[in-house]
Structures are given as structure tokens and as C-alpha cells.
A protein has these predicted regions:
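Cytosolic juxtamembrane N-terminal segments of multi-pass membrane proteins
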Residues: 1-76
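Intrinsic-disorder/low-complexity coil detector
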Residues: 23, 37, 101-103, 181, ...
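Long amphipathic alpha-helices with heptad-repeat character
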Residues: 50-78, 126-169, 187, 204
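Transmembrane alpha-helical hairpins and terminal membrane-anchor modules
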Residues: 71-147
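Charged, low-complexity cytosol-facing tails and large interhelical loops of integral membrane proteins
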Residues: 141-256
């Protein structure tokens, strides 16, 4: 998402009453750009508990801090590296020329390397406490504090679809069952955004492989996926919910 397009954060209440937040923030430098977007809005189906919102806000603080560290490391990497390299050279020459007692070359290298690494770490720690970084930290935290959640009928429909997969004895059976579309009335860019954020939770090839097995109805696919999910501690109901939503959205695009 670019420009001033609204970024949504989705709060879904699960069948057991716990909460899940879907959002694009991952603690990388892109998070800084997203948090600086003037339009960030939270949407919920069932009303969230204060404790859930507080916990999520603290999570965003942590992600913003990680993003800020990545940003500072990239912005100041070159000058810190050059200064550390210069200290390495100076230390090596000092040990080689100035120190009277001969020091083995290997020891000179190790000592000089330790000095340069210590200098780099100290410079990085100092930079994270700089006025520039602190100003950006305050801006990000203030931005997080201004995010407001409002009720959404679309998110309510999505919650119902998630509950369908959680309430069944087996989430895979709920996915494969030929039933009415639980997302029939959930359309538009909000659903696409939810799907995008869910895909961030299931990003690697392992998930793609299991997805193909299920959607192609391969022999023994359901049992293989159950075993895989158990071994990898996968949130199977959420994964099946994601696949069902992905299949629904893809089908609509094909028939347009």
C-alpha cells in the first residue's frame, strides 16, 4: 500500500474468546513507512477487550522499536564501519610499531579486531539514544496511540467464517465440506487486505505445498496435512480459514 491509502488493523475474536490481530507491521524498515501513514484505522467484529488492545499496543511499540533499530543501523552503518575500520588500523599500527615488547602478529590482529568491534557496538548504542532517534521514537509511539478501532460488519462475517473452522471437530473437514460460502457477503478491498495479512502468517514453501495438497484433493492429503500441522505446531483452524477465504476471493476474480 502506498500514498495516503488507509491501512487497516483487524481484530478478530476467536471461538474460545481469545483475540487475533491482523496487520502489516513486521518490525522491519517498511514498518516505519506504514506507521507514518496518516490514515491507520482499526476494525473489529465483536467488541475487543481493553486488555487485548493494551497488549496489542505494546506489541506495536516493540515492532516499532525493532524497525527503528533497523533504520538507524542502515542509516549510520557506513560512518560507523569506516570509523571502526580506522580504529582497527590505528590499533594494529600501534601494537606493531609503538609497543616495545614484540607482540605476535596474530595477537595484534585479534586485539585490533576486538577494539574495532567494541567501537562499532558502542557507536551503535550511542546512536540509538541520539536525539534524532528519540524524536522518531516519540513520533512513532504517538502515532500508535492515536489508532482508533471501530465496528465493521465485514469483520463480523469474517469472524463467523473463522468460528466455523474452529468449532468443527476437524478444521480440514470444514474446509473441504461443500457448504454455503461463509464469506458470500464479505466483499471489497477489506477482504483483500485481510487475505494479504493472513498470507504474511503463512509465507514459506511448506505452507504452499500443503495448500496445493488440500485444494487438489490429493489422496491422503488431509491426513498428511494434519500430521504436518501437529509436527510444526501450526494454527490449523486459522490456516484453513485462510485457504477458504483465498479460494473464495480467487473464485470471484475468475468469474468477474
Amino acid at each position: 500500500m502506498t500514498g495516503a491509502e488507509t491501512i487497516h488493523i483487524f481484530h478478530l475474536v476467536r471461538h474460545d474468546g481469545s483475540a487475533i490481530f491482523l496487520h502489516p507491521f513486521r518490525g522491519d524498515q517498511n514498518t516505519l513507512d506504514l506507521l507514518e501513514n496518516p490514515q491507520i484505522e482499526g476494525l473489529y467484529g465483536a467488541e475487543p477487550q481493553v486488555a487485548s488492545l493494551t497488549g496489542f499496543r505494546n506489541e506495536l511499540y516493540s515492532l516499532a522499536e525493532s524497525a527503528l533499530r533497523a533504520w538507524d543501523s542502515q542509516m549510520r552503518f557506513l560512518p560507523r564501519f569506516v570509523l571502526s575500520a580506522a580504529l582497527f588500523v590505528v590499533s594494529f599500527l600501534f601494537l606493531s610499531i609503538v609497543v616495545r615488547d614484540p607482540v605476535p602478529v596474530l595477537d595484534e590482529l585479534l586485539i585490533s579486531l576486538a577494539v574495532s568491534i567494541a567501537a562499532y557496538v558502542a557507536l551503535r548504542a550511542r546512536g540509538r539514544g541520539s536525539e534524532r532517534v528519540e524524536r522518531k521514537r516519540i513520533t512513532l509511539r504517538s502515532r500508535i496511540d492515536t489508532i482508533v478501532f471501530s465496528e465493521s460488519s465485514v469483520v463480523q462475517l469474517l469472524e463467523e467464517g473463522l468460528h466455523m473452522h474452529e468449532a468443527e471437530q476437524d478444521a480440514i473437514d470444514a474446509l473441504l465440506a461443500e457448504r454455503g460460502d461463509p464469506f458470500a457477503e464479505a466483499e471489497g478491498p477489506i477482504v483483500d487486505e485481510v487475505l494479504q495479512y493472513l498470507s504474511l502468517r503463512f509465507p514459506d514453501r511448506g505452507f504452499r505445498r500443503q495448500e496445493r495438497r488440500l485444494l487438489r484433493a490429493e489422496r491422503g492429503a488431509a491426513e498428511q496435512v494434519r500430521h504436518w500441522a501437529s509436527q510444526q505446531s501450526i494454527d490449523l483452524p486459522l490456516f484453513c480459514f485462510y485457504l477458504r477465504l483465498k479460494r473464495t476471493v480467487g473464485s470471484r476474480k475468475v468469474h468477474r
